[in-house]
């Protein structure tokens, strides 16, 4: 099977038959990709317009991340963002992406109290936002929540290693799983898989350890700063496209300079308006 078709793109037409339309990516498609050795990309998305572009590009999974706290709302960390701030973003992404699996982050404070709190938060994202799955941070400590959500029919993406919501207790942005801590990271990965998570994000984990965990688990692993051997990779789209300000994390590669292009376009637009060049005759009725 070609990579193009694995992503749910239109199937080639047989002689005398129309092409088959793309289908919505589901969790079992990701499992099949892992089994067949196909790697896949995930990006964050926070609005209809970018979700539409990423969906057209064939990105199979879109994450409405709590990173919206930083890139949408301007908070310093992901801790302050609320469910009420995230649900409208999820709605827009779901409308813009008819083919991608849309995953919503459960924000800090919405699930730590226990399974009942996690179910209440996840249910809101599924019912009010239209999300197809939710993501929550933590390993063994949230296994009970993951099991409760999956038993209720809610697909869960886990997140281990560096967990941004715990930045204050982790002592800042630090690689996790080095040395003796590797065993705990492995235990976390096994715990979330056994609890029923359909995939697990591994953030800022040594590449060798991430490779080991990917080999141990039957569910897909998704790396962000976890080396090239995870089943999938994820980046915040503003980091990937050159929209973020300041120094990028080591694991980020900029694939474009969208920020620079927007600044140039806005500057040129303002200049032409001030000079009376825009609107020209061709823009008038």
Swiss-Prot record:
Localization, UniProt: Cytoplasm
Cofactor: Mg(2+)
Listed InterPro entries: Pantoate_hydroxy_MeTrfase (IPR003700), Pyrv/PenolPyrv_kinase-like_dom (IPR015813), Pyrv_kinase-like_dom_sf (IPR040442)
Domain of life of the source: Bacteria
UniProt main location, coarse: cytoplasm
UniProt KW Metal-binding keyword: yes
Cofactor: record remark: Binds 1 Mg(2+) ion per subunit.
Enzyme Commission identifier(s): 2.1.2.11
Catalytic-site annotation from UniProt: 203
UniProt binding sites for 3-methyl-2-oxobutanoate: 66-67, 105, 135
Spans through the membrane: none
Pfam families membership: Pantoate_transf
Matching SUPFAM superfamilies: Phosphoenolpyruvate/pyruvate domain
Protein family membership: Belongs to the PanB family.
UniProt function note: Catalyzes the reversible reaction in which hydroxymethyl group from 5,10-methylenetetrahydrofolate is transferred onto alpha-ketoisovalerate to form ketopantoate.
Complexes and interactors: Homodecamer; pentamer of dimers.
Name of the protein this chain belongs to: 3-methyl-2-oxobutanoate hydroxymethyltransferase
Organism of derivation: Mycolicibacterium paratuberculosis (strain ATCC BAA-968 / K-10)
């Amino acid at each position: 099977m070609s990579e193009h078709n694995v992503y749910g793109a239109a199937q080639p037409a047989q002689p005398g038959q129309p092409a088959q339309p793309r289908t919505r990516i589901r969790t079992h498609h990701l499992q099949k990709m892992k089994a067949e050795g196909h790697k896949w990309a995930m990006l964050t998305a926070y609005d209809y317009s970018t979700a539409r572009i990423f969906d057209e590009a064939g990105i199979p999974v879109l994450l409405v991340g709590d990173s919206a706290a930083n890139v949408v709302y301007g908070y310093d960390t992901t801790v302050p963002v609320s469910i009420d701030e995230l649900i409208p973003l999820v709605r827009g992404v779901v409308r813009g992406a008819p083919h991608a699996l849309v995953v919503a982050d459960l924000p800090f404070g919405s699930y730590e109290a226990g399974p009942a709190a996690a179910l209440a938060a996840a249910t809101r994202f599924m019912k009010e936002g239209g999300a197809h799955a939710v993501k929550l941070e933590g390993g063994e400590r949230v296994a009970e929540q993951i099991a409760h959500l999956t038993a209720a029919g809610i697909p869960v993406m886990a997140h281990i290693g560096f967990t941004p919501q715990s930045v204050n207790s982790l002592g800042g942005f630090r690689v996790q799983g080095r040395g003796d801590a590797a065993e705990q990271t492995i235990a976390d990965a096994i715990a979330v898989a056994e609890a029923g998570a359909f995939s697990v994000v591994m953030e800022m984990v040594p590449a060798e350890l991430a490779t080991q965990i990917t080999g141990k688990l039957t569910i897909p692993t998704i790396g962000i700063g976890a080396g090239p051997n995870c089943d999938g990779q994820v980046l915040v789209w503003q980091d990937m496209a050159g929209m973020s300000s300041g120094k990028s994390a080591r694991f980020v590669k900029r694939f474009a300079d969208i920020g620079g292009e927007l600044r140039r376009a806005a500057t040129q637009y303002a200049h032409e308006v001030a000079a009376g060049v825009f609107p020209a005759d061709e823009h008038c009725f």
